[in-house]
């Protein structure tokens, strides 16, 4: 408090506390839904985002055989530990008490088997992204691995292959027997060659395949999509820091201001969904720009008919927009969002054509430039050539009418 200017007065406000818990299913309908969910997760290939139940059953059938290749899983202790990396970390054992105190009740309540019987003929099963959220499901997968089974993890959205560092995914998903990507084939580990390389399998994902070239303009609206703004960093990755997210939010203001009143009148803003401990989003934007309307309801159908899409971050929506052929402009501060070398090269090509900008104001200037006919600019030969390169690297689409054959062939070979 002593560092404040003399004219300032500091007042300590009331403590703000949010508690988010996963309620136990109550009632017959909820219990039935929970049971069906557990049965779905028990499939060799559970239903994943963007995939149908029919595909999950077909892909599960393709994984019924014993594994046909040597196990390519990487040991965390053997590849990522301080000993494996040649580091000396003298952390006192007393520090473990801190970790124990923060251990979630969902994990603390688990009971682990003392012994696991090995599989006679190890098989591969695909892991749902729920392995990050469901402690019991995660334990089930750990038992599978403990018995010698192999895991296939599957990319479920953006950032994979694009962020320079994505430590949780690197250690949890990339270390498994195989990882199905949306097109990319390599990742430069933060720990270098000593940590090894993942078994990356580029496959056309159904979530993107269904949207292939599906954009048809039906409105005069530009949709401006934002992302989560956490005030506490909850994993080590190449996202902005909490302080940088404050500037990220300020950039939204400069972007909307630079659009001018005519474009703002046609602008819809799409905030990220509510997450505990994040900055105010729409509550901060809309009062500053009353002309801007809130984009509500399912996002997919709206962007498939919009006049122009603008993104202030890279993520799943960018990949879907490229697959669907939506006229899209992007901006973000590259020092806030460090990217992989492959994505960085592609951003250079996108910047040369005005598809991506390093500042909010320059992006707004491009919006005004193409506003009369965004589709004419988007469908120009140079822009479409870069779009095709983007799709080949980060949003792979099937060669034929269906993506199923590529998946079935791959799964049968594992």
Question: Locations of the language-model features?
Answer:
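Catalytic-core helical/loop segments in enzymes performing group transfer/polymerization on anionic/lipid-linked
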Residues: 1-414
């Amino acid at each position: 408090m002593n560092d404040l200017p003399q004219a300032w007065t500091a007042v300590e406000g009331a403590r703000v506390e949010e508690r988010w818990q996963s309620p136990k299913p109550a009632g017959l309908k909820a219990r039935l839904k929970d049971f069906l969910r557990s049965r779905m997760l028990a499939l060799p290939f559970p239903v994943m985002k963007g995939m149908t139940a029919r595909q999950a059953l077909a892909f599960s059938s393709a994984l019924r055989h014993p594994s046909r290749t040597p196990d390519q899983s990487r040991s965390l202790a053997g590849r990522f530990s301080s000993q494996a990396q040649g580091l000396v970390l003298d952390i006192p054992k007393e520090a473990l008490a801190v970790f124990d105190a923060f251990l979630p009740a969902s994990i603390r309540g688990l009971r682990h088997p003392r012994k696991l019987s090995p599989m006679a003929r190890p098989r591969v099963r695909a892991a749902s992204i729920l392995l990050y959220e469901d402690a019991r499901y995660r334990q089930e997968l750990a038992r599978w691995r403990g018995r010698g089974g192999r895991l296939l993890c599957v990319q479920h959205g953006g950032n994979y292959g694009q962020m320079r560092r994505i430590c949780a995914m690197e250690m949890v998903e990339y270390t498994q027997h195989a990882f199905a990507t949306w097109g990319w084939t390599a990742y430069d580990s933060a720990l270098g060659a000593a940590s090894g390389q993942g078994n990356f399998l580029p496959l056309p994902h159904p979530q993107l395949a269904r949207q292939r070239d599906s954009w048809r303009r039906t409105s005069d609206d530009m949709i401006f999509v934002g992302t989560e703004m956490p005030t506490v960093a909850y994993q080590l990755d190449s996202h902005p820091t909490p302080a940088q997210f404050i500037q990220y939010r300020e950039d939204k203001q400069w972007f909307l201001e630079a659009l001018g009143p005519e474009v703002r009148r046609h602008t819809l803003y799409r905030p990220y969904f509510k997450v505990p401990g994040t900055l105010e989003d729409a509550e901060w934007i809309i009062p500053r720009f009353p002309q801007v309307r809130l984009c509500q309801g399912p996002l997919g159908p709206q962007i498939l008919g919009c006049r122009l899409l603008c993104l202030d971050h890279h993520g799943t929506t960018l990949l879907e927009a490229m697959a669907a052929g939506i006229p899209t402009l992007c901006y973000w501060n590259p020092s806030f969002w460090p990217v992989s070398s492959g994505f960085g090269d592609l951003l250079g090509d996108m910047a040369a054509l005005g598809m991506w900008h390093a500042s909010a104001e320059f992006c707004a200037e491009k919006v005004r430039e193409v506003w009369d006919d965004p589709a004419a600019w988007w469908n120009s030969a140079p822009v479409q050539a870069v779009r095709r390169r983007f799709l080949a690297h980060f949003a792979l689409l099937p060669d034929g009418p269906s993506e199923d054959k590529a998946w079935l062939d791959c799964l049968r070979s594992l």
